[in-house]
């Protein structure tokens, strides 16, 4: 529900400004591409969170289960890559991608991080290791972030510059965003410290002393 509502709406928002957005990104398929990308990056974020949490709380990391998640993401990434390429070809914008402009170079970097690197990692034996899974997740997540930033900043930079203006988030926008991330992180620490989410399961911390050590560490942070 969240991806379908939020991501589709975010993609639809830019359909109303095709003359302001660079043609590389200005497509009628944008809402669907936003939704699809959120579907396959979701497992990437889950993989990063799972590895960090299990390492942090001294729990066993199920690499086989995580590899299954990468398989799902890799298939959707391949579909996204094909759809994106077909859209560029049909709109006659493929040449702009390889024109060595800022927009073209940023788009290539976006696709490499979002699709190419994760798919290659998944196909290699390295993709079944903890390190490979972590790189898979980080690449996909960074690629999605760059995708959104390219639409907001890179894709509209030429139009804004033509009007003699510029855009950069205000101090309050930056602080409020960082604050939301910190609030979510502190809430996560509080929940894991005060509710039995991780301990008491085979493969978790083996002794009460380990649990107390984790508790003291988190208390120091909070």
What annotation goes with each model-predicted range?
Residues 23, 93-100, 126-133, 152-172:
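Extracellular/periplasmic helix-loop-helix junctions in multi-pass membrane proteins
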Residues 132-143:
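Central hydrophobic cores of alpha-helical transmembrane segments
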Residues 1-127, 143, 202-208:
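Long, contiguous internal "core" modules enriched in hydrophobic/ aromatic residues
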Residues 115-122, 147-151, 180-192:
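Hydrophobic alpha-helical segments of multi-pass membrane transport proteins
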Residues 81-84, 145-156:
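Hydrophobic alpha-helical transmembrane segments in multi-pass integral membrane proteins
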Residues 157-167, 177-222:
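Extramembrane terminal tails and long inter-domain/linker segments of multi-pass membrane proteins
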């Amino acid at each position: 529900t969240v991806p379908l509502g939020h991501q589709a709406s975010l993609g639809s928002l830019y359909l109303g400004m095709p003359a302001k957005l660079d043609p590389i990104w200005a497509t009628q398929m944008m809402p669907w591409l936003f939704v699809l990308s959120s579907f396959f990056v979701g497992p990437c974020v889950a993989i990063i969170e799972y590895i960090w949490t299990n390492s942090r709380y001294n729990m066993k990391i199920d690499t086989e289960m995580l590899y299954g998640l990468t398989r799902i993401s890799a298939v959707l990434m391949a579909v996204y890559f094909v759809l994106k390429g077909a859209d560029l070809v049909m709109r006659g914008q493929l040449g702009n991608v390889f024109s060595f402009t800022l927009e073209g170079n940023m788009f290539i970097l976006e696709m490499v991080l979002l699709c190419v690197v994760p798919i290659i990692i998944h196909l290699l034996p390295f993709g079944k290791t903890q390190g490979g899974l972590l790189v898979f997740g980080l690449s996909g997540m960074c690629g999605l972030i760059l995708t959104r930033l390219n639409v907001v900043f890179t894709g509209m930079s030429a139009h804004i510059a033509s009007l003699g203006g510029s855009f950069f988030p205000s101090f309050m926008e930056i602080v409020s965003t960082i604050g939301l991330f910190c609030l979510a992180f502190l809430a996560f620490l509080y929940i894991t410290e005060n509710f039995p989410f991780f301990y008491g399961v085979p493969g978790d911390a083996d002794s009460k002393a380990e649990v107390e050590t984790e508790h003291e560490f988190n208390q120091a942070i909070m």
